[in-house]
Amino acid sequence: MRRAAVVAAVGALVAGFAVYGSAQAQEDPARDASGATAASLREAAAASGTFVGTAINDGLLSNPTYANIAASEFSSVTAENAMKWDTTEPSRGNFNFSGGDRLVDFANRNLHQVYGHTLVWHSQLPGWVQNGGFNAEQLNQVMVDHIDAVAGHFSGELAYWDVVNEVFNDDGSMRQSVFQTTIGTEYIANAFRAADAADPWANLCINDYNVEGINAKSDALYDLVSSLLDQGVPIDCVGLQSHLILGQVPGDLQENMQRFADLGLEVIITELDIRMDLPADSGKLAQQAEDYAEVVTACMNVPACEGITVWGISDRDSWVPGVFPGQGAACVWDESYQPKPAYDGMLTAFGG
Ligand code: G3I
């Protein structure tokens, strides 16, 4: 809860700044006909005390349409790739913060909070770490040094950090990352302690996918965070990535969020997108609008759910088609940056 007051203050500012209302949203006849009163997702979300964010590819901020939607519709931005290890420390001790700094600058100019993603992850991990042949003590030092430099660089600028990302297999066993196999599970507690020392301001999260419903993996996550809390490890939040499939929002999403909230943690929907088999059609898009609304409603029903980040603005920029051939249309804006029915679904569910 360390940054809660700051985030709330930003939310209040956001709600009061008509200039940040989206011209695009106001011109949308469908939205006018719906009777929605909020001019943007960020206004609607702020009015209900939550943030609404998007992942940003900072290379696309030079596209005015992209930048305008990012600025006007969202109150939080996450670096899609720019704060990951392969970008920030491509070789040992050589740091590159240019993309992250651009994002922080964009966020400060548009009254966004910044969500840091991610300090320790098995993917987008440079070869010098993955294949460095370090022993446990050495790798732990490499990890702590990385956290110290990266979280230290951005200290005071970020509302959240995903300290560790995707530490589990889907069956709830520990993913056999180089950190797990070399250091053991204690690398997770070590990472949180290092992040807390480097940035005492950010809320510190553990983030994963396929943990939205109650299942073996979310049970393992629950057990792990319970144990971290028992050990006094500085953990503040759980991120449910929420890369979902059309028509398959887990019915127990709210119940699952609530059990983490009951541990005293914040819960964040960190990477929401809802993919479908292509081509999209009006029936699928209507279902997608219901699905997005269902996720927002579940978050709104859990006071500890502080916000929702969608993973990218438009279908044009989404990671989905590259990884799931034949699937896509997962975002809230289409390939031409026009809002889809999912936009109204989210807006209405936020109370707009
Ligand atoms: O930067 C290189 C560029 O130099 C090279 O020319 C180009 C050629 O393919 O690749 C570029 O790197 C790509 C990188 O995105 C930056 O654009 C990688 O190939 C590509 O694999 C990478 O994809 C990212 C993916 O994480 C990597 O796992 C996606 O953009 C990003 O949306 C995705 O995000 C993850 C979250 O971090 C964690 N949760 C799952 C989520 C979706 O996979």
Describe the residue ranges of each PLM region.
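Secretory targeting and sorting signals
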Residues: 1-26
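Aromatic-lined carbohydrate-recognition surfaces of secreted/lumenal glycan-active proteins
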Residues: 52-57, 162-163, 189-218, 268-271, ...
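Acidic-and-aromatic substrate-binding clefts and catalytic sites of carbohydrate-active enzymes
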Residues: 55-67, 85-98, 168-173, 211-220, ...
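Boundary/entry segment of secreted carbohydrate-active catalytic domains
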Residues: 31-80
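Active-site clefts of carbohydrate-active enzymes
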Residues: 118, 203-211, 242-243, 260-292, ...
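Substrate-binding cleft and catalytic face of glycoside hydrolase catalytic domains
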Residues: 72-90, 98-211
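Short, acidic/polar
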Residues: 57-73, 140-150, 216-228, 253, ...
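Aromatic- and acid-rich polysaccharide-binding/catalytic face
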Residues: 74-81, 165, 198-208, 221-248, ...
